[in-house]
Amino acid sequence: MILPVAIGVALLGGTAHGMFHRNSRVFGSVLGELPPDGRRVSLTFDDGPNPEATPRILDSLAEQGVKATFFILGAHAERWPDLVLRVSREGHQIGNHGYFHRKLHLRSPFYVKRDITLGKRAIERAGVDTPRFFRAPHGFRSPWVTSIASSLGERTIGWSLGVWDSDLPGVNAIVDRTVEGSRPGSIILLHDGDGYNINGDRSQTAAAVPKIIAALRDRGFEFVTLPSA
C-alpha cells in the first residue's frame, strides 16, 4: 500500500512542478537561463506593447545600445501594430506571449494551439518576422504547451529572475531587485504592458530600465539577446 501511495505522490509532485515552475523540463525543453560563461544577462519584457511604456523603454534601450526580447500579446499587437514594428526595426527580438494572456496549464490542446497561433498571426500582421520564441503567461504549462509551441517553430522560454515589477513596488525597488538578483546567465523578466488591463500602468518599469542598465554595467555585466537554438 505504501508503494502505490509513494508513486502517486511522486507523480503529483512531478506534474505540479511541470505545470507551475517556469523552467521545469518535465513537459519538455525550456530555456530558463543563459550559459553562465562570462557576465552576460538578457532583458526580456512581457505583455506589451503599451503606448506609454513601450516607447520609453525602447528609447532607453536605444540610448544605451542594448538589445532585448519583447514577448508580445496578440491582442495588444492588433491594437498597436506600429509599436510591434518599431520593436523589430530597432533590432530587438520578438517572442509570442499568446493572444489572450490566459494561464495555459489547465487548457485543452485545442485551446493552447489556438491561443499561440492567434498570437503568432497578430504579430505577423504587424509586418514583422514570425516569432521564434514563446513564453507562457505566468510560465504555467501543461504536457502539450511546449510541444505545440515547438510545432509552430517557437522555442519555449522561461526566466531566472522575476522582480515583480507588475506589482508596482516603486522604481527603486524594481532597480534594486533586478541588480541584486542578477547573476551570470540571468534571463530577467520585466513588463512593458499589462496582460489584464490594456491601459495598465508600466511607468515604473519604464523609469527603472535606464537605471538597471547603468547599475548592471557598473557591475561588469553585458547585455545579450536570447539564443535561437
Task: List where the protein language model places each region.
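A short acidic, helix-capping loop that chelates divalent metal ions and anchors anionic groups
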Residues: 102-107, 195-199
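Hydrophobic alpha-helical topogenic segments used for membrane insertion/localization
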Residues: 1-20
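Charged helix-capping and loop-helix junction motifs
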Residues: 111-116, 171-176, 202-209
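His/Asp/Glu-enriched short active-site or ligand-binding loop at hydrolase and phosphoryl-transfer sites
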Residues: 140, 145-181, 221-228
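Divalent metal-coordination and catalytic microenvironments
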Residues: 46, 61, 94, 134-137, ...
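A cross-domain feature marking catalytic cores of carbohydrate-active enzymes
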Residues: 45-47, 72-74, 96-98, 136-138, ...
